[in-house]
């Protein structure tokens, strides 16, 4: 039974990821005044399937000097962790209702760093290694602010369980009282998922393709799937934290519709940002975090700690 539940979660995720790549190419196309993929199937709808067949039937080449075990394990680990992070997400019911769901997700996203580091190091290529080191530094740095923002939100929530966030936001979405946190959270999720304008890891001009430069065929596809699964997962988390998950004041019954609409809007914003902004310089990226975001989030965290005490209010109890 649990296996069926697991499959009923994994298969839709992989399908969503496949069509997200198509949506991205279409949006980028129209924003650059051209059409996206439109040959395979009606309006290019079957393009992701063609891409998958092409990638998985190609020969998985491997550099002679690479460390075989790590080279093969890295993409598998990346995808496994990306899918594991979906387990505590309430949509509207989680696969496993964890008591410390948010901590579990933070821990899993920290482990994802190892997949990137292994792939860069095992490739035995200087480009891959530099890309991996950049990715690791960026991910670890932005996790600091993500954790502090989460803490601030949880002070209004009262527990580490994601399901209680939905109860907290029945009357007011948390984006209204804590919009500065929400803005910094969104920018940090962009950096955490290595998306433009923070995609320093795959700076084509200097690093060819970043940490996955030596990968081809199937293993490359696994990294690709992991990246896009993380994007959707982060947007679902943002929806749950700040946008009241599946609550809507006008249509409270339409759980799934509300939830999917909010997540899709956030995902489209990710793609819109990618099409609009140039890449940051690496020192600017670090400056933004350590000198702008970190002091701000710490100050706001102190503010959120003092709020319930001064207002003599308690968060919803579970």
From Swiss-Prot:
Cross-referenced InterPro entries: NADH_UbQ_OxRdtase_su1/FPO, NADH_UbQ_OxRdtase_su1_CS
Record-listed E.C. numbers: 7.1.1.2
GO annotation, biological process: aerobic respiration
Cellular compartments per GO CC: mitochondrial inner membrane
Entry's localization field: Mitochondrion inner membrane
Catalysed reactions, as listed in the record: a ubiquinone + NADH + 5 H(+)(in) = a ubiquinol + NAD(+) + 4 H(+)(out)
Source organism superkingdom: Eukaryota
Main location: mitochondrion
Top enzyme category: translocase
Molecular function in Gene Ontology: NADH dehydrogenase (ubiquinone) activity
Keywords for the protein's UniProt record, in alphabetical order: Electron transport, Membrane, Mitochondrion, Mitochondrion inner membrane, NAD, Respiratory chain, Translocase, Transmembrane, Transmembrane helix, Transport, Ubiquinone
Membrane topology of the entry: Multi-pass membrane protein
TM stretches of this protein: 2-22, 70-90, 100-120, 147-167, 171-191, 217-237, 254-276, 294-314
Keyword Lyase: no
Similarity section: Belongs to the complex I subunit 1 family.
Task of the protein: Core subunit of the mitochondrial membrane respiratory chain NADH dehydrogenase (Complex I) that is believed to belong to the minimal assembly required for catalysis. Complex I functions in the transfer of electrons from NADH to the respiratory chain. The immediate electron acceptor for the enzyme is believed to be ubiquinone.
Protein name: NADH-ubiquinone oxidoreductase chain 1
């Amino acid at each position: 039974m649990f296996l069926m539940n697991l499959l009923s979660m994994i298969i839709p995720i992989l399908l969503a990821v496949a069509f997200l790549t198509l949506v991205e190419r279409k949006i980028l196309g129209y924003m650059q005044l051209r059409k996206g993929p439109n040959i395979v199937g009606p309006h290019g709808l079957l393009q992701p399937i063609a891409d998958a067949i092409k990638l998985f039937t190609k020969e998985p080449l491997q550099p002679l000097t690479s460390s075989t075990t790590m080279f093969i394990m890295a993409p598998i680990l990346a995808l496994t962790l990306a899918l594991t992070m979906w387990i505590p997400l309430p949509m509207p019911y989680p696969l496993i209702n964890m008591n410390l769901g948010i901590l579990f997700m933070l821990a899993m996203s920290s482990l994802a760093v190892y997949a990137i580091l292994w792939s860069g190091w095992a490739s035995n290529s200087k480009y891959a290694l530099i890309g991996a080191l950049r990715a690791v530094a960026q991910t670890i740095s932005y996790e600091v602010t993500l954790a502090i923002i989460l803490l601030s939100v949880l002070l209004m929530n009262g527990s580490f369980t994601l399901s209680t966030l939905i109860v907290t936001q029945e009357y007011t979405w948390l984006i209204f009282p804590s919009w500065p946190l929400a803005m910094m959270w969104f920018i940090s999720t962009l950096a955490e998922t290595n998306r433009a304008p923070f995609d320093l890891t795959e700076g084509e001009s200097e690093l060819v393709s970043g940490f996955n430069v030596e990968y081809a065929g199937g293993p490359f596809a696994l990294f690709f799937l992991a990246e896009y699964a993380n994007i959707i997962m982060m947007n679902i988390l943002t929806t749950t934290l700040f946008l009241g998950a599946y609550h809507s004041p006008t249509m409270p019954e339409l759980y799934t519709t509300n939830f999917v609409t909010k997540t899709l809007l956030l995902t489209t914003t990710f793609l819109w940002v990618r099409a609009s902004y140039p890449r940051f310089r690496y020192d600017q990226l670090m400056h933004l975090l350590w000198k702008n975001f970190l002091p701000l989030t710490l100050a706001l965290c102190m503010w959120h700690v003092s709020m319930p005490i001064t207002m003599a209010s308690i968060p919803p109890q579970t």
